[in-house]
Amino acid sequence: METLFNGTLSVGGRDQESTGFAWWSGNARLINLSGKLLGAHVAHAGLIVFWAGAMNLFEVAHFIPEKPMYEQGLILLPHLASLGYGVGPGGEVVDTFPYFVSGVLHLISSAVLGFGGVYHSLIGPETLEESFPFFGYVWKDKNKMSTILGIHLVILGFGAWLLVWKAMYFGGLFDPWSVGGGDVRVITNPTISPGIIFGYLLKSPFGGDGWIVSVDNMEDVVGGHIWIGTLEILGGIWHILTKPWAWARRAFVWSGEAYLSYSLGAVSLMAFIACCMSWFNNTVYPSEFYGPTGPEASQSQAFTFLVRDQRLGANVASAQGPTGLGKYLMRSPTGEIIFGGETMRFWDFRGPWLEPLRGPNGLDLNKLKNDIQPWQERRAAEYMTHAPLGSLNSVGGVATEINATNFVSPRSWLACSHFVLGFFFFVGHLWHAGRARAAAAGFEKGIDRDNEPVLSMKPLD
């Protein structure tokens, strides 16, 4: 009887002897079988889209309109809401039907992809080169690889333009900076200036500079997508029409495993960027849907207690705290009026609920005394009690109530998951890059399976 460990197991007509890989190496057995590898990739896409559709419908089924999205552990509906679907002024959900439609469309798409995956895995030709030369390829064919890269870039460019079209012509996006607490807004005047758009890329990633994570208006977001979408389409056409230059042919390793390593490195970078975006940014990740950022929760607590104590008669401009610094207000290193207390570390925070109270020199005392609106008080109190924290100390002064409701912010989920997965993908990038470079140099054929201990063990039965 065959077991999973005796090396003779044949899955889909491919065994360890003929492919050089054991059954558990998965798609490595299909490296030179373009048709079967297509099936694996299409089936994988089907699984991804199925998860998106099923999870989408799961969130719709459990959604409670009276509660904020971030209090319900949702991660997909906030993305749809950010795109302007189903929400109105203040980020209030007015219609869940678009969310239902999104889930159903993804499920239907996953069925098509699933069928295609099964077909190409089990029925379709093992290799595409003979029957469908356009879709066929050989990993070492540098010109074909360049063409495939170009096709991918064109598709990605159209993806970026889809957001632009949604923002400008198909209903707009949710803009948390709209007056009165955010609203869906058509972006009519996106930022085209290369100085502004590429200025983000040249900024420091640290502190208040924040690289591209510091984007704080929808015009720049849409303008950035116009630029990157256009560049990707033009770059894709370039790669389709041209052949790699001599320096590129020499510089890169041209093998399936090398391309895998490049892809893993790119996905890793995107995961780390997504981690920082979801944790720090409250423009493209509106706090109305994802909950406050860490600095936002801390600042909102200082604001909430300033409002309370001012009503009780405190002079918030001159009251001293236990350290001798201002209890409610103090000055930043650059002389601006900022909130006092531990939240001073977040003095450069910017948020839609707070900005109306600023003047030319930081927070405006006159506005703090006379112009605070009820919606600002409500939002700050809500954000204060929903900090994205998993820590008992060093939380920027936010009260950590051990008997509070068990709340985990979607920002915590998204940032932590993308950081961990980004790290794993980076390790995978290093692993496969090392193997690919070694194979290209001719001194590495992978781990020697002939001396695998399990091969000398007797069958389990």
UniProtKB/Swiss-Prot annotation:
GO annotation, cellular component aspect: chloroplast thylakoid membrane; photosystem II
Transmembrane segments: 57-81, 122-143, 166-188, 243-263, 279-300, 435-459
InterPro entries for this protein: PS_antenna-like, PS_II_antenna-like_sf, PSII_PsbC, PSII_PsbC_sf
Modified residues (N-acetylthreonine): T3
Positions where Phosphothreonine occurs in the chain: T3
Propiece residue ranges: 1-2
Positions contributing to [CaMn4O5] cluster binding: E355
Compartments reported by the entry: Plastid, Chloroplast thylakoid membrane
Membrane topology per record: Multi-pass membrane protein
Keyword Cytoplasm recorded: no
Domain of life from the UniProt record: Eukaryota
Cofactor note: Binds multiple chlorophylls and provides some of the ligands for the Ca-4Mn-5O cluster of the oxygen-evolving complex. It may also provide a ligand for a Cl- that is required for oxygen evolution. PSII binds additional chlorophylls, carotenoids and specific lipids.
Record-level GO BP terms: photosynthetic electron transport in photosystem II
Gene3D superfamilies found in the cross-reference section: photosystem ii from thermosynechococcus elongatus
Primary residence: plastid
Record's keyword annotation contains ATP-binding: no
Keywords: Acetylation, Chlorophyll, Chloroplast, Chromophore, Manganese, Membrane, Metal-binding, Phosphoprotein, Photosynthesis, Photosystem II, Plastid, Thylakoid, Transmembrane, Transmembrane helix
One of the record's GO molecular function terms: metal ion binding
Family the UniProt entry places it in: Belongs to the PsbB/PsbC family. PsbC subfamily.
Subunit organization: PSII is composed of 1 copy each of membrane proteins PsbA, PsbB, PsbC, PsbD, PsbE, PsbF, PsbH, PsbI, PsbJ, PsbK, PsbL, PsbM, PsbT, PsbX, PsbY, PsbZ, Psb30/Ycf12, at least 3 peripheral proteins of the oxygen-evolving complex and a large number of cofactors. It forms dimeric complexes.
Function summary: One of the components of the core complex of photosystem II (PSII). It binds chlorophyll and helps catalyze the primary light-induced photochemical processes of PSII. PSII is a light-driven water:plastoquinone oxidoreductase, using light energy to abstract electrons from H(2)O, generating O(2) and a proton gradient subsequently used for ATP formation.
The protein's name: Photosystem II CP43 reaction center protein
Gene name for this UniProt entry: psbC
